[in-house]
UniProtKB/Swiss-Prot annotation:
BP-aspect Gene Ontology terms: fatty acid biosynthetic process; fatty acid metabolic process
Cofactor list: Fe(2+)
PROSITE patterns hit by this protein: FATTY_ACID_DESATUR_2
Record region (Disordered): 1-57
Keyword Transferase appears in the UniProt entry: no
Enzymatic class: oxidoreductase
InterPro entries: FADS-2_CS (IPR005803), Fatty_acid_desaturase-2 (IPR005067), Ferritin-like_SF (IPR009078), RNR-like (IPR012348)
Compartments (UniProt record): Plastid, Chloroplast; Plastid
UniProt name for this protein: Stearoyl-[acyl-carrier-protein] 9-desaturase, chloroplastic
Subunit details: Homodimer.
């Protein structure tokens, strides 16, 4: 999925504007469950991690659940036929989908080792900071079980049985199946590159899936589909920018991989934004209130609870590198918001309640206010320190 913006490199802790990263808080870990391992630790921090329970590296927000009234749930049930005709068309048949092996050396071929050597030669030209971003993107994609779980919390649109034939359930399962290829492909390619510490990466993935995510969507599909619309757009932007940078550094295969993943994300973005477009059509007041609510909460990115067993602020550090490289920035955040405001024609809404009008004004005025902070973000980034990343064998990268 996508990245977040980092308070180290972006000064978004303004009272009047939302920040774009989770609130920095002390770690809160349950005393009940503790990790055990027979492996020796290579650092005091890792030794300490062995005693930590299965809980996020930072506090999550107070959980609000099932905030949507029954009459709104009925709206989603009534949209079952609409979803079948308008949502499922954005899925591709499995036989027409690309698969990771299409872009990887064939291990059964006689020149497999030569192909791997070619990948590793190209990998030498990729700088460490781009590897940090590529690995962070891959880890985000690999936490797919969390995202399917999140979608299946949405009242009126969840998969009630695990194999429900409803259009909403079919979409969620098939979307998950398409997304599953992304992490598989990035993981295998980065493994073959020889430039990254796969054990550290695999630990980070396990920690992240175990921690879950905290999107604050309240089991409410109005909130949930605003969130996924933003996220798919952000992921499209992020992978697209990674493709551009990989190409600039001479790895055309990595550029191709990031590009095809971005193409999938764009198709998924189209589907999710179409859902919210329909909600604006049939229930504009509740939908604009949901849009404003998610923006006031600040869109927390899917991997915001990322942890490698050592760095409690790993996601912030990863995000700072992405911001500095131009992979995902404060400007992108504002651009995505402005895109969605235009896509859903929020400025043209009429007949809203007084609260709906306030929400409309809020989301429409927010993008230019965010953009005014971009220059300050760039200035602060110039003074950022360097940090070691376990994913690249503790090599130092400027934040």
């Amino acid at each position: 999925m996508a990245l977040n913006l980092n308070p180290v490199s972006t000064p978004f802790q303004c009272r009047r504007l939302p920040s774009f990263s989770p609130r920095q808080t002390p770690s809160r870990r349950s005393p009940k469950f503790f990790m055990a391992s027979t492996l020796s630790s290579s650092s005091p921090k890792e030794a300490e991690s062995l005693k930590k329970p299965f809980s996020p590296p930072r506090e999550v927000h107070v959980q609000v659940t099932h905030s949507m009234p029954q009459e709104k749930i009925e709206i989603f049930k009534s949209l079952e036929g609409w979803a079948e005709e308008n949502l499922l068309v954005h899925l591709k048949p499995v036989e027409k989908c690309w698969q990771p092996q299409d872009y990887l050396p064939d291990p059964a071929s006689e020149d497999f080792r030569d192909q791997v050597k070619e990948i590793q030669e190209r990998a030498k030209e990729i700088p460490d900071d781009l590897y940090v971003v590529l690995v962070g993107d891959m880890i985000t994609e690999e936490a797919l079980p969390t995202y399917q779980t999140m979608l299946n919390t949405l009242d009126g649109a969840k998969d009630e049985t695990g194999a429900s034939p409803t259009s909403w359930a079919v979409w969620t399962r098939a979307w998950t199946a398409e997304e599953n290829r992304h992490g598989d492909l990035l993981n295998k390619y980065l493994y073959l590159s020889g430039r990254v510490d796969m054990r550290s990466i695999e630990k980070t993935i396990q920690y992240l899936i175990g921690s879950g995510m905290d999107p604050r969507t309240e089991n409410n599909p109005y909130l949930g589909f605003v969130y996924t619309s933003f996220q798919e757009r952000a992921t499209f932007v992020s992978h697209g920018n990674s493709a551009r940078l990989a190409k600039e550094h001479g790895d055309l295969k990595m550029a191709q991989i990031c590009g095809i993943i971005a193409s999938d994300e764009k198709r998924h973005e189209t589907a999710y934004t179409k859902i919210v477009e329909k909600l604006f059509e049939i229930d504009p007041d509740a939908t604009v209130l949901a849009f404003a609510d998610m923006m006031k909460k600040k869109i927390s990115m899917p991997a915001h609870l990322m942890y490698d067993g050592r760095d409690d602020n790993l996601f912030d550090h990863f995000s700072a590198v992405a911001q500095r490289l131009g992979v995902y920035t404060a400007k992108d955040y504002a651009d995505i918001l402005e895109f969605l405001v235009g896509r859903w024609e929020v400025e043209k809404l009429t007949g809203l309640s007084s609260e709906g009008q306030k929400a409309q004004d809020y989301v429409c005025s927010l993008p230019p206010r965010i953009r005014r902070l971009e220059e300050r973000a760039r200035e602060r980034a110039k003074q950022a320190p360097s940090m070691p990343f376990s994913w690249i064998f503790d090599r130092q990268v400027k934040l």
